[in-house]
């Protein structure tokens, strides 16, 4: 499993906004601090605004801020928003059951791996990330 650039950047943006909280932060400032292009930053912000992780105010003096407290921004939820699924194999993330599930000797291992991954990321918040070096 590999987390996409979008997922990693979304987490960095949320940590940045949390660290520079209290007021509105211009998107260009976050982009400059995080080394993210303006175009890519706009895509990430649109996704985060849509799901309420970020609030945006347009116009003079506008900018962005967290849409909820950093301790309510769960890494697992954010990664599922940006990645779609944290399942390590396609058969666990599709709507239809895998035709080989009944005879597959590895499906149990993949399910457990997915459970461990979700439990791990669901136990971390943006506030926790602010404490790490």
Task: Annotate the PLM regions.
Residues 3-5, 9-36, 55:
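N-terminal helix-turn-helix DNA-binding core of bacterial DNA-binding proteins
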Residues 32, 49-50:
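Alpha-helical residues within the helix-turn-helix
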Residues 39:
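Key DNA-contact positions within bacterial/archaeal DNA-binding proteins
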Residues 45-46:
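Short, hydrophobic-biased segments on the C-terminal half of alpha helices
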Residues 50-53, 81:
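Residue cluster at the C-terminal edge of the helix-turn-helix DNA-binding motif
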Residues 53-66:
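Beta-hairpin "wing" of winged helix-turn-helix
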Residues 67-133:
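Non-DNA-binding regulatory cores of transcription-related proteins
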């Amino acid at each position: 499993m590999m987390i996409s650039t979008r997922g990693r950047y979304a987490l960095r943006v949320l940590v940045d906004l949390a660290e520079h909280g209290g007021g509105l932060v211009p998107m260009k400032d976050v982009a400059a601090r995080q080394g993210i292009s303006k175009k890519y930053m706009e895509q990430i912000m649109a996704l985060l605004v849509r799901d309420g992780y970020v609030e945006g105010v347009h116009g003079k003096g506008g900018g962005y801020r967290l849409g909820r407290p950093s301790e309510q921004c769960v890494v697992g939820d954010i990664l599922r928003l940006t990645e779609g699924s944290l399942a390590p194999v396609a058969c666990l993330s599709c709507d239809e059951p895998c035709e080989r599930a009944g005879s597959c000797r590895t499906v149990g291992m993949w399910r457990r791996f997915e459970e461990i991954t979700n439990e791990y990321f669901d136990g971390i918040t943006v506030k926790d990330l602010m404490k790490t070096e």
